Amino acid sequence: MNPIDIAVLVILALFALAGLYRGFLTSLFNLGAYLVSILLALLFMPLGANGIRSSESLYNMMLYYTEGSEYITNAEYVRADISSISSQELSDIISNAHLPYPMAKEISENIATEAFADQGVTTLGDYFNQTIVCVFINILVFLAIFALVRLILAFVINGVDYAWSFPLLRSGDSLLGMGLGVLRGMFALFLLFMLLPIGLTILGQFELVQALVDHSIFSAFFYRSNFLLALMPGA
């Protein structure tokens, strides 16, 4: 168990205690607010991402900081046309790149479908650049919209609870609230782990950070099996 695992357990414990204290109904509404916030973030993410792409200066700045082609270990492949690279070569290149999740999957899909052909993008290096910056932008926009909607819903829920006070169940209210608190904590962890590919992309391949992730018990679930990251488009 490493620091990431300890942090995960602490977060789950805090959410469990919050659910225990707040009770079933408040915890249920808060969990519902998470789900609504996620759905709205997914719905409006393309609009926000297009807004960023339409700003040339902002988009170029993000392209500069992500610089996906640096993950290609063989410089000869950076300028190679994707049509000249075999599927086995591509598989080896992506495998050796040690890309943050879900970059490898999105790059493979974009190359297979030639997703950026209409923009005149043909080289492997540019496909790495464009795909990684698109995933990067989509994650940022998704998290920003989620945070905004969640904040608004939190004010509404807390205001209603303060004005009328949600009733308690006759039995098991606190325990059910604690269970919902743990579930909400899991959603919160999925959201927090969405920051990991952003950090790894900007900071580069730090061996210490990568080692912590690789040896974490919980990262296999909250990071590599993150259903929210899997929903982030790469184009």
PLM region spans:
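Alpha-helical transmembrane segments and their juxtamembrane interface "caps"
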Residues: 1-235
